[in-house]
């Protein structure tokens, strides 16, 4: 596949950003220690997996991306739209064990160096933000709830520079095979973007939704130039050899870890 995300042993990396001091990527599912499912490279401590497995996977990823896990930060995601400012004081949060810190956070941003923002995914949209000019990075977790409640807009509220200097990468997530019902469709029709651009009605109470496109449209609506938004062709629901899919695997699956850091 011709995509800016390039395959590595246990992750995909946005390769061209490495020379700009940005480490941006997402883990893949295979060649791990977890039985969730068998030989899975699960990165979530909050599902039924041995803590040892997640720690070993973290160490493996840290070596592959050359970013010490002691500098990672992980929030407790709740499918909302709250955003946290992260500093070096937060490094290590929820990495060795889960705590009450950063609970209810589905987006983070920082201006600090050597901090790796991380979150778990298995169909929801990872939205990465960066500006090398202003030394800014952010990461958002946008499922249908986060997309509907405009979590990308909430992140943009914390950008204190011209949005022409901001770049956004929309990472691997479910494709438009993901379907919603009439009630959820009606919610999306209240957003300030044209739902016809990302929702397709397929039958009674069945509507396919492209969450990646919805987030791209919202970002552009709120001022991020189209040419500054990159959307990967990788999809969790279309590439099960690479990714976990919560919906297709009926919840019995692991989680990928999306990450972004800057030197």
Curated annotation (Swiss-Prot):
In its UniProt record, a GO molecular function of this protein is: oxidoreductase activity
Q: Name one Pfam family in it.
A: Cu-oxidase_4
Q: Which UniProt keywords apply?
A: Copper, Hydrolase, Metal-binding, Oxidoreductase, Transferase, Zinc
Looking up InterPro entries in the UniProt record yields: Cu_polyphenol_OxRdtase, Cu_polyphenol_OxRdtase_sf, Cytotoxic_necrot_fac-like_cat
- Bilayer-crossing residues are none
**Entry's EC annotation:** 2.4.2.1, 3.5.4.4, 2.4.2.28
The reaction(s) this protein catalyses: adenosine + phosphate = alpha-D-ribose 1-phosphate + adenine; S-methyl-5'-thioadenosine + phosphate = 5-(methylsulfanyl)-alpha-D-ribose 1-phosphate + adenine; inosine + phosphate = alpha-D-ribose 1-phosphate + hypoxanthine; adenosine + H2O + H(+) = inosine + NH4(+)
Annotated family: Belongs to the purine nucleoside phosphorylase YfiH/LACC1 family.
Summarize subunit and interaction data from the UniProt record for this chain: Homodimer.
Return the protein name: Purine nucleoside phosphorylase SA1030
